């Protein structure tokens, strides 16, 4: 896999940046690490009017993204449990806060399609998490 660290961020340009860049091909290769998928009919239902998102996009872009988000959710939950056990908070009924994903962009760029697609794919993750969409209007209300 071809991983490229981002531009150095220190004064002497020796330490790589905090992010990595992957080609679409390298990212798509990560799709094999998950079996989560949707069929064409479901994708048709999710897509917005005139939205170009293809099943190939789902496989090459959204499946690896879903798996990565799933890993973050799982390990965030494990950290919550371990922290509560260490701090002896389990007896106080501390509840885990939701894992929130924000999607931003200009008007009519596909934010709703991305949100619906992630909701569908994440809902098919191994632990079958509850996934809700909260629109800006619903959030502000």
Locations of regions flagged by a protein language model:
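Extreme N-terminal, non-catalytic leader segments
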Residues: 2-11, 17-100
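Short beta-strand-centered segment that lines the nucleotide-binding/catalytic pocket of NTP-utilizing
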Residues: 125-141
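Hydrophobic, Leu/Ile/Phe/Ala-enriched alpha-helical segments that form helix-helix packing faces
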Residues: 69-73, 118-126
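Short, glycine/charge-rich beta-strand/loop segments that flank catalytic centers
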Residues: 84-87, 100-106, 134-137
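Catalytic micro-motifs at enzyme active sites that drive phosphoryl/nucleotidyl and oxygen chemistry
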Residues: 88-93, 106, 120-124, 138
